[in-house]
Design a protein with these regions (language model features):
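N-terminal active-site segment of His-dependent metallophosphoesterases
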Residues: 1-65, 71
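His/Asp/Glu-rich metal-coordinating catalytic cores
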Residues: 41, 54-67, 72, 77-187
Length: 187
């Protein structure tokens, strides 16, 4: 099995034209590499875009690249990050999902006891089971992890991947970004 993990891409972040070109070139090279290496799937755990609805030029570029991935038969599994999150599914990510270019793996159900149960998306080629939680700004997603029904996730057999967007306290370096991180025990 071979997969790519592309996180914090932040398409649309750059405002200066020369930097926009670099931003797009880097993403284009990553996509081309995924296609040429024939990865089984691509994981994007948040912040594909810098905002939930980027400029039209960014949307056009993204749709063209994801069309290439789709045409190559490579599924893309995504969760929102803290920058491209939309509580009402009002994001370019949702448009990409509606046309079938990507799949959001944030399938959650609220249980009677208040816990959150995640359902898995099964990759057709590999059988890998993927579930995830989107990232929210300033660590507000912590409450979801506190309510997460871990028992059902752990009871699921087979190879599983949990897709999330956020920092882990134990992995933070001295030169790392400041912000809200979660302890590894919450995952």
């Amino acid at each position: 099995m071979r997969f790519a993990h592309l996180s914090d891409i932040h398409l649309g972040f750059q405002k200066h034209e020369a930097l926009q070109k670099i931003e797009q070139d880097v993403f284009e090279r990553a996509v081309d590499e995924c296609i040429s290496r024939r990865v089984d799937f691509i994981l994007i755990p948040g912040d594909l875009f810098h905002v939930n609805i980027p400029e039209m030029r960014v949307q056009k570029f993204a749709f063209a690249k994801f069309r290439q991935i789709y045409d190559a038969g490579i599924p893309v599994y995504v969760v929102y990050g803290s920058h491209d999150f939309s509580p009402v599914s009002n994001s370019v990510i949702d448009l990409l999902a509606v046309v079938g270019y990507i799949m959001k793996v944030t399938l959650a159900t609220s249980l009677d006891d208040g816990r959150i149960k995640l359902d898995f998306v099964v990759d057709k080629k590999t059988g890998v089971k993927i579930a995830g939680l989107s990232g929210l700004k300033v660590g507000k997603d912590r409450v979801y992890y506190e309510k997460l029904d871990r028992e059902s996730l752990e009871a699921e057999s087979g190879l599983k991947i949990f897709l999330f967007h956020g920092g882990i306290s134990e992995m933070k370096t001295e030169s790392g970004m400041d912000g809200e991180n979660m302890p590894l025990s919450m995952l």
